[in-house]
């Protein structure tokens, strides 16, 4: 993997007001993106810009427009739009790139920037390295006559709604479904409710009143507890929770149980087989549940594991010429529908499976035996130093010895937050918790040493 200074697994992120998330730095980043596009033969072409509902989005949206215009790129503004919607417009506008202002599932005080290449695919590491090289150069402006113009895309939300609706067969009996949506006060708030209502479902909408500061605040795909309760209270069939920018989805069955990304992948695999579109390969990650791998194998499907991060899932999908992949966190990519993870599209695949196969969400995963996973995170600034410390390395060896032949251990730095994630998987939940808690305690001790 190519070493990058600023880009993580999903673009650039940070706390607003601290580098890199200052207006000056973000403008420089946008100029760098535009400059790389010019170097690669896209001078003066269209670049799409969209954002989620964070208050700081106004600030960074304008900084990006200024930077792109300074590099001579033509800018088309989408306003608030789910990240996969921006990928869709990048593809259908045949734009040189799409730029997203979002920190996805992070707290509102964070923000970030991610970039789609032509075709709506996330940038490869090599392109991000080219952009970072420009960030080390002083910003310059093209000649005044070559500066980029700025336009607003008309009816963008309505166009994306129609795209989502057309991703599944028409005339399915959605009127049979009672849904509860959790829009995380994020970018799906003005899109997802209309998608499901226009298809005919009875829709109860929660967390769809963004004020700029409440995105992901105790809601959405990373906090589904309230959705679980609401589904049971409303006697709904299904709950659907998106994250702040709409590229993740987690679902809830009628009994209030979580249906995570691994279970969603299994349902999509079943649905495609039912329709005669058998999948030979599905791409997961190092975090993908062993139970899913075993269940897919029984269906004649091979699970390939990518590094954690939907960008790496996409790379493997393209390399293997496969169609479906994702992460247990809810990033689900259906490359024959959209070019990136799309929460609405993934949810529609599951609902179409229920309606066409005349079954329930509960029954679709009845034969999926997931193994127990214990996942915990700890905030660490000097992540590499802590992970490579002798104490943590010894603790890892001890943990692996305890789990020998009884499970597996994964410890990794987050690609989107200053955290270290520790995951243990196996059949003995008590053992898994003990192993993870001991490792977390050692990491916290070493964090103090390296602070």
From Swiss-Prot:
It catalyses: alpha-D-glucosamine 1-phosphate = D-glucosamine 6-phosphate. Binds 1 Mg(2+) ion per subunit. It comes from the Bacteria. Activated by phosphorylation. Mg(2+) binds at residues 104, 243, 245, 247. Its EC number is 5.4.2.10. The active site is at residue 104. This is Phosphoglucosamine mutase. It comes from Dichelobacter nodosus (strain VCS1703A). The lineage of its organism: Bacteria, Pseudomonadati, Pseudomonadota, Gammaproteobacteria, Cardiobacteriales. The gene is glmM.
């Amino acid at each position: 993997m190519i070493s990058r200074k600023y880009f993580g697994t999903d673009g650039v992120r940070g706390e607003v007001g601290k580098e890199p998330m200052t207006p000056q730095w973000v403008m420089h980043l946008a100029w760098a993106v535009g400059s790389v596009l010019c170097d690669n033969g896209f001078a003066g072409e269209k670049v799409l810009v969209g954002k989620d509902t964070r208050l700081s989005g106004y600030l960074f949206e304008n900084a990006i427009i200024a930077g792109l215009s300074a590099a001579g790129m033509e800018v088309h503004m989408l306003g608030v739009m789910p990240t996969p919607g921006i990928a869709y417009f990048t593809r259908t506008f045949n734009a040189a790139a799409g730029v997203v202002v979002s920190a996805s599932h992070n707290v509102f005080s964070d923000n970030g920037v991610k970039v789609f290449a032509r075709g709506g695919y996330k940038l490869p590491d090599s392109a991000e390295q080219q952009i970072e090289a420009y960030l080390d150069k002083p910003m310059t402006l093209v000649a005044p006559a070559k500066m980029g113009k700025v336009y607003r895309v008309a009816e963008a939300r309505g166009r994306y709604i129609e795209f989502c609706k057309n991703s599944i067969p028409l005339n399915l009996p959605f009127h049979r479904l009672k849904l509860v949506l959790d829009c995380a006060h994020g970018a799906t708030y003005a899109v997802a409710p209309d998608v499901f209502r226009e298809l005919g479902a009875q829709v109860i909408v929660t967390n769809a009143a963004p004020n700029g500061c409440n995105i992901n605040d105790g809601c959405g795909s990373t906090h589904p507890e309230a959705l679980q309760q609401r589904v049971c209270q409303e006697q709904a069939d299904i709950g659907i929770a998106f994250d702040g920018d709409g590229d993740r989805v987690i679902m809830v069955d009628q009994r209030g149980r979580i249906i995570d990304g691994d279970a969603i992948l299994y349902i999509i695999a079943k649905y495609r087989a039912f329709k005669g579109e058998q999948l030979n390969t599905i791409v997961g990650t190092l975090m993908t549940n062993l139970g899913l791998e075993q269940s897919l194998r029984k269906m004649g499907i091979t699970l390939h594991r990518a590094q954690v991060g939907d960008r790496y899932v996409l790379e493997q999908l393209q390399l293997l010429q496969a169609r479906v992949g994702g992460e247990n966190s809810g990033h689900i990519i259906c490359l024959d529908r959209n070019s990136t993870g799309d929460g609405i599209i993934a949810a529609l695949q599951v609902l179409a499976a229920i309606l066409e196969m005349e079954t329930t969400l509960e029954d679709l995963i009845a034969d999926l035996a997931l193994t127990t996973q214990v996942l915990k995170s700890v905030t660490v600034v000097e992540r590499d130093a802590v992970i490579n410390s002798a104490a943590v390395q010894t603790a890892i060896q001890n943990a692996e010895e305890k789990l020998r032949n009884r499970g597996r251990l994964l410890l990794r730095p987050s690609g989107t937050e200053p955290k270290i994630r520790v995951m243990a998987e196996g059949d003995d939940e008590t053992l898994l918790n003990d192993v993870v808690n001991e490792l977390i305690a050692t990491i916290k001790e070493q964090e103090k040493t390296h602070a």
